[in-house]
Structures are given as C-alpha cells and as structure tokens.
C-alpha cells in the first residue's frame, strides 16, 4: 500500500534552501539525534522539510504548537505530497472539562466533554496510516504526548478478512462488536455495520467515504468489495481487508478480566490505607465508584472514565510512561518540531498541571492511585521516545541550541530575495505622535501597520487616540477566539483597516505580506514581551514586504534590543550579499488573502449536472467565515441528515453534491478548530 514519497511543487529549492536541505540530510544520515533549522520568516522552511522527507523517504511526525498552525501545516504538506498519506492528529475535543475536586468548597466537578467525530476519524486514519504505510506524514499538536491505546493491543484486536477464508457470519458479527462497532440496519454511518442475508456492510471508523461489503457463501468469504456508502456504487473488488477498532482504547476481553483483578487488588490496598488514616468518607466514596466501574467493565467491556485504569489495561507498571502516538511511529521515523521555541516549553508544562489535579482526586477518594499514570509524557520521557529530531524556528530556544551543539543550519536567504526589515530606534517621549505620522505615510500608499504595546490599557488608549485622529484601526486582544482572530487578520490584509494594535502580536504562523511597518512601543522595557526572541519574532512580521521596516521606541538600548538588532543586521547583510552576487531584485509576495483559511485541497465549487435542476446547498461564499466550530459542526450534521435523506429517496446526484459541500465545510472546521 505504501508508495515512495513524491514531492509535488512547481518550484525548485533556491536561496539558502539547497544548502539547508543538504546539511540536514547529511546530519540525519550521520545519525545526529538533534538538529536545528534557523529559518527566517518567509524563507520556505516547510518546503525545505518536505524536500528532506522526500529525499530520505522516512515516515515523519510534525509537531505544531497549536491547532491553527497544525491545520496550516497539514494543508501545505497535502499540497506537497498529494499521492502520499498526509494525516492530521489533534485533540478531538470541541469542549473538555476534566474531572476535578475543589476541597475548599467541597465541590466535585464531573468530567464533561464534547467529542468531534470528524477529528476522531482523522486521528484513527492517522494511526492506521502509521501502522500500514511508510509514506506517511502526520501533523500533530501537543495532543501527541497524551495517552493513547497501546499499539500492540490495538493490532491484536484487528479483524483480517481475505477472500476464500472460512469464517462463520456470527463470528464476524461478534468480532465487530468487540471492536465496538454497532449494528444499525437503518442508518449506515461511520463505525456501524448492517446485515442483509449473507451480506455484511461495514463502514470503517477511520474512513470518510468508503465502506466494505463482505459477501459470504455459507461459511466462506466469497467476495470483498469497496463501495460508496452514499450511492452504493462498487468502487473496486479486493483480495483482503483489515478492519481496525472503532476507538484507540479497545482492549481484548482476556486483558480486561486480568485488569479487573488487578484493580480489585489495588482497591483493597487503598481501602486499608484510608481506613488506617480514619478517612471513612473517602474509603466509602472510592469503593462505591470503583465497584460501579468494575461492573460496567464486566458487562460492557468499558466504563465511563476507563482511561483512569489505562495502566492495567496496557499492562504497564507503576510510573511507566503511557502509550502515545510516538509508539505508533516506526523506529527510523523522523520528528520535526515546528516553532520549537514555543512547542518545547509546552511539552514540558503538560505533565505538571495534570499531576496536581489528579493528586487531589486520589487524596479525597475519587480515584485510585493508578489514575496518576493516566497522564501526558514527562519531558524526560518525551526526550527518550523522540526519534531523530529537527527543531524548526526563526528564534530557536536555548534547549534546541544546546541539543544541537551550537551547530545550527541557517536558512536566512529567501527565494524571493526579500530582506529583513530596516530597524530604527527612536525616543519614547514622542513615540505616539511619531507613530501617527508613520501610519499616515503607510496608509497613503495602501500599506499596513502593526503596533505592539506592553499593556492592555495602553493598547486600548492608543486605539482610541488613533481613532480620534481619523485612522482606521482595530485592537487585537486575548478574548478574541481563533476564528475571529483570523477574520481580523483577513480584514487587515484586505484593507478594511490600516493599523492593528495588540500586546503580543508575535503569534507564529499566519503571515501578512501587506504589513510594511512594525512599531514596538516601550522596546527598552526588558521582560518577556521585549526579550530577544520576542523582538525578533515581532520584527519578522514586516519581513514579507519589500518596504519592510521596524521602529523600536526606547530611550536606551537594552541587551535584548542589541542582540535582536545585531541578529537582524547579520541576516540582512547575508541576504543583500546573496542578492548582489546572483543579481536578484527583491520581489514582494502576492499571497491570496483566501489562503489564510486554505487547507491544501482546492475544493472546486460543485456545478449542477444533468439538466441543471440541482444546485449546491452550501456555496463557499454563503458560509460565514466567522462561524464558530460549534456552528460549523451543527451545519455539517444538518447537511449529513439531508444527504442521507436524498440517498434514501434514490436522489444520488443531489446527495453526492451535498457530500462535496461537506468536504469543504470539514476543511473549514479543521481551520476553525
């Protein structure tokens, strides 16, 4: 099923890219465990990594710091590798309230979560691809370090069907039930099966648009075929097929029985400890809750909150790391940590927050001590599990630099010839009036301005002041969610307004080629928002414009300012020298504004077929770009119901049309999530 990685791009590596690709590949072939790619904004870091993957033909996991950036990377990788398995693995919760107890008010908060089934399907598709194929790129968020079903148990539970095999129909149905598939002869949807005589139709949990038909002759599998679950049209006949479990957390019956005995032993030991400490209420609470879970597991094979018993179900010892997505990555896999200066500290912080909450639950009798082993990886465990790693950032952190031994692969020269912004330092006393005059100059030539302040109050006051003086200005603050933030950036690029004011505008990921000026107020106030890395990231926001300029307002030059200015000048000098040697004139980027929400596949608007009676239900332009993930999901559910209705009425053309629209809505949903 695997194919070789085949890179699809109209461009050839240029600028610093060929040298960066060569050095990274040499390092990987020499067995270097850690390498750092220092790639400036707009230098084509993703393209460089795609070339490395294609040349070395190794399965790869790309870690991104948030869902927005993960969606963007997923789209870019899908464009680079249209014929290979590019997968998406992020948290499938639209909403998640973990189980918690507040001793001060004696308040227990039940776990409450809303699972998004489309992302769940993509997660299952990702692990399936990692187990079956070599040509796989999985773009993941920090969700990858959280506990997942054990791959060994997951593989044991798979159902293999081949043409000619002897198997009883009841045995197939029993195995499907063990895989947590449900029988539904009326509504055929993902994770269900239906039976019609000697024909079993199965809709695999990881599939979006293909189902399996198993035709039996007595106790022999006579034919296996793949078909479109919507139209019933046969796509192809196949010699064999493997059905994967409906969830990552499925466990064989014998393992559950063994786990139940181990849970009983731990419960007895914990009860003894609680009674010795005169904690009668806690002992009663723990006994009641655990006995209920054991009865559920005995009857159904699972229970609510079964992840708290994951240590017993996976057969691991106390304190051992939980199975995660890293266990599915082959031994020769490659890990790429994007925006590593943000992602690495995130990985380090996940374990501690989770531990503090669970210790309270254990202490007050809501959970057994083994629940502490249902956790994300500790940082040391992540380091031990990580394969050969490439850290990618414009401002690598101390950790990455230390691990790479100071040998950093530079990617400073942009293929477009664009230079890093010119930097000026101006006094604080006149910063607001000076800024106003700069804004007017830029607005007159249809260019945009970003302004970053130190406090929320100052950002609000500055926005008000600029509005009073007739400037078109918006203020970006922490209460704005991802979708609205993307909408504001889109409006800035379209010229709905000229100035965007914020406190922390160095958010990695989305780029704005129209921005020609970045103004940093109070740049001489040393601290988190004015550190060397923050300054370089913020200055980089103007690096995609030919007239890029950054003004730092400060009465003195701090060590962070000096380092940021020095690094920017070093890059600019190298870029200028390269341009002169190769006769390159810097070219501005004409990136389409719609690209902000693009996810790799250009979904063509569905055209009416036949006699032109049918028309698309959801044209792209009719979908508000600021729809929340919840609203998008509701729209998707409505259309799915309508699609099934058309299919039942044998109106397959209309149903197929809605299906195409659903593809587009799901792409939008991933971006919004």
Curated annotation (Swiss-Prot):
Chain ranges for the short sequence motif Beta-hairpin as given in the UniProt record: 92-115
Function per UniProt: The UvrABC repair system catalyzes the recognition and processing of DNA lesions. A damage recognition complex composed of 2 UvrA and 2 UvrB subunits scans DNA for abnormalities. Upon binding of the UvrA(2)B(2) complex to a putative damaged site, the DNA wraps around one UvrB monomer. DNA wrap is dependent on ATP binding by UvrB and probably causes local melting of the DNA helix, facilitating insertion of UvrB beta-hairpin between the DNA strands. Then UvrB probes one DNA strand for the presence of a lesion.
Gene Ontology cellular-component terms listed: cytoplasm; excinuclease repair complex
Family named by the database record: Belongs to the UvrB family.
Domain UVR: 633-668
Single GO MF annotation: DNA binding
InterPro entries in UniProt: Helicase/UvrB_N (IPR006935), Helicase_ATP-bd (IPR014001), Helicase_C-like (IPR001650), P-loop_NTPase (IPR027417), UVR_dom (IPR001943), UVR_dom_sf (IPR036876), UvrB (IPR004807), UvrB_inter (IPR041471)
Annotated localization: Cytoplasm
Residues spanning the signal sequence: none
Positions contributing to ATP binding: 39-46
GO biological-process terms attached to the record: nucleotide-excision repair; SOS response
Organism in which the protein naturally occurs: Escherichia fergusonii (strain ATCC 35469 / DSM 13698 / CCUG 18766 / IAM 14443 / JCM 21226 / LMG 7866 / NBRC 102419 / NCTC 12128 / CDC 0568-73)
Record keyword Hydrolase present: yes
Record bears the keyword Magnesium: no
Main location: cytoplasm
Ranges of residues in domain Helicase ATP-binding: 26-183
Keyword annotations of the record: ATP-binding, Cytoplasm, DNA damage, DNA excision, DNA repair, Excision nuclease, Helicase, Hydrolase, Nucleotide-binding, SOS response
Listed name of the protein: UvrABC system protein B
Pfam families, sorted: Helicase_C, ResIII, UVR, UvrB, UvrB_inter
Phylogenetic classification of the source organism: Bacteria, Pseudomonadati, Pseudomonadota, Gammaproteobacteria, Enterobacterales
Top-level taxon: Bacteria
Chain residue ranges for the region called Disordered: 608-627
Description of how the protein assembles with itself and partners: Forms a heterotetramer with UvrA during the search for lesions. Interacts with UvrC in an incision complex.
The Helicase C-terminal domain, residue ranges: 431-597
UniProt remark on domains: The beta-hairpin motif is involved in DNA binding.
């Amino acid at each position: 099923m695997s194919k070789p990685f085949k890179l699809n791009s109209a461009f050839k590596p240029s600028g610093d890219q060929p040298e960066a690709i060569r050095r990274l590949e040499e390092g990987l072939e020499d067995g270097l465990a850690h390498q750092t790619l220092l790639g400036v904004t707009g230098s084509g870091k993703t393209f460089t990594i795609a070339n490395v993957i294609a040349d070395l033909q190794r399965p790869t996991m790309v870690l991104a710091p948030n869902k927005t950036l993960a969606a963007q990377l997923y789209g870019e990788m899908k464009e680079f590798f249209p014929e290979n398995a590019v997968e998406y693995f992020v948290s499938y919760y639209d909403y998640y309230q973990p189980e918690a107890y507040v001793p001060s008010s004696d308040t227990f908060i039940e776990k409450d979560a809303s699972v998004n089934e489309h992302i769940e399907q993509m997660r299952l598709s990702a692990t399936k691809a990692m187990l079956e194929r070599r040509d796989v790129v999985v773009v993941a968020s920090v969700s990858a370090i959280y506990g997942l079903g054990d791959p060994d148990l997951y593989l044991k539970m798979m159902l293999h069907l081949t043409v000619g095999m002897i198997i009883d129909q009841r045995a197939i149905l029993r195995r499907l039930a063990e895989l947590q598939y449900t029988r539904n002869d009326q509504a055929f949807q993902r994770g269900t099966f239906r039976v019609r005589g000697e024909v079993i139709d199965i809709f695999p949990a990881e599939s979006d648009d293909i189902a399996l038909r198993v035709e039996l002759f007595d106790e022999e599998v006579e034919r296996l075929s793949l078909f479109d679950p919507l139209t019933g049209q046969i796509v192809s006949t196949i010699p064999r097929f493997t059905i994967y479990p409906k969830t990552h957390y499925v466990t064989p019956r014998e393992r559950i029985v063994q786990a139940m005995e181990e849970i009983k032993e731990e419960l007895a030991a914990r009860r003894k400890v609680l009674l010795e400490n005169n904690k009668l209420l806690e002992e009663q609470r723990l006994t009641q809750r655990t006995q209920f879970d054991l009865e559920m597991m005995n009857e159904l094979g699972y229970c609510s909150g079964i992840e708290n018993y994951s240590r017993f179900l996976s057969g691991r010892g106390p304190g051992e790391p939980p199975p995660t997505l890293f266990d599915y990555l082959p031994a020769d896999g490659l890990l790429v940590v994007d925006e590593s200066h943000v992602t690495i500290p995130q990985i380090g912080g996940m374990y501690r927050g989770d531990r503090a909450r669970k210790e309270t639950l254990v202490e007050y009798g809501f959970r057994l001590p083994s629940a502490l082993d249902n956790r994300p990886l500790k940082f040391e465990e992540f380091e031990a599990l990580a394969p050969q790693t490439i850290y990618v950032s414009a401002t690598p952190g101390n950790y990455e630099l230390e691990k790479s031994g100071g040998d950093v692969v530079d990617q400073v020269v942009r293929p477009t010839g664009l230079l890093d912004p010119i930097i000026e330092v101006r006094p604080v006393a006149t910063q607001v009036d000076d800024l106003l005059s700069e804004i007017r100059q830029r607005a007159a030539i249809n260019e945009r301005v970003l302004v970053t302040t130190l406090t929320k109050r100052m950002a609000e006051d500055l926005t008000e002041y600029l509005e009073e003086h007739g400037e078109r200005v918006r203020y970006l603050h922490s209460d704005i969610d991802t979708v609205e933030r993307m909408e504001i950036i889109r409006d800035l690029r379209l010229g709905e307004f000229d100035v965007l004011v914020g406190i922390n505008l160095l958010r990695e990921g989305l780029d704005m080629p129209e921005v020609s000026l970045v103004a940093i107020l109070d740049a001489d106030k040393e601290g988190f928002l004015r550190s060397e890395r923050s300054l370089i990231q913020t200055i980089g926001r103007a690096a995609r414009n030919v007239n890029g300029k950054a003004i730092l307002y400060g009465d003195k030059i701090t060590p962070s300012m000096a380092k940021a200015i020095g690094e920017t000048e070093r890059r600019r000098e190298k870029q200028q020298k390269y341009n002169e040697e190769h006769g390159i004139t810097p070219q501005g980027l004409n990136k389409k504004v719609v690209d902000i929400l693009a996810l790799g596949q250009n979904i063509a608007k569905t055209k009416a077929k036949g006699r032109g009676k049918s028309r698309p239900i959801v044209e792209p332009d009719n979908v508000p770009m600021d729809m929340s993930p919840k609203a998008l999901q509701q729209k998707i559910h409505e259309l799915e119901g309508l699609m099934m209705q058309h299919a039942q009425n044998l109106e397959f053309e209309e149903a197929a049309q809605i299906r195409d629209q659903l593809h587009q809505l799901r792409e939008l949903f991933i971006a919004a999530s």
